[in-house]
């Protein structure tokens, strides 16, 4: 059974989620979001949204246009699901909260370009719990309409642009930010502008009728994005599409905590994890407020809050 730990406020820290690892504010006006998609993507988005509306529990929400990496991750992990495109990360999370989707597939970090912006507050604010994580190998393609000529500008999500920045600099191509990779491909297909290309998955090029000019242009040989699968804490998992991969036996807990910017404050706060043999696999800092008097940290630890050793470590964190 997967843990369904909800957000638990405990003075200076929050337990956000506990989940097994996989082996590998009001109603949103989501219908108006259709205008944010390029013309080439609108028909596909409308079709996918209509199918998801007929069977919301089978729907898995994602940010972006059809053909983006989140869409691919859903196809890999939930082959029997109904992908539900949403224009923003907040929209995807809201779709789950409003019952328009049973789950959401959200990227949180990349091996080349680090964490995905805003996830450290969007996820805990959503109140959803992590069911699983999924690691997707990323293959960025330079795509453009036939006859685009010499490419001088490229459109894509900032994460994709960051993962390919050295390649783009070496080829004297200027980067332009877009809401997502597949959406960039759709816009390039609509514009048919000389010299303009997109960075996107090959699937997006196929969907929007673009040529693949280059493949595998990331700045590292291994480019992997970590996704998390989120759902409501009280979700009946038997009602949702099954996860393709078997779950491993390892439980992970993610948490946020805040410490004052004083000597040894962080050391004292996390000392309990080491003392109780709890492995911390991730620790990131975020500035807390405008006073710069405290820092917020995001951490992943092995185990679940109900385990004695994890509970003891959390008690020490709580005390500090």
Residues covered by each model-derived region:
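Domain-level signature for soluble enzymes in the chorismate/prephenate branch of the shikimate pathway
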Residues: 6-320
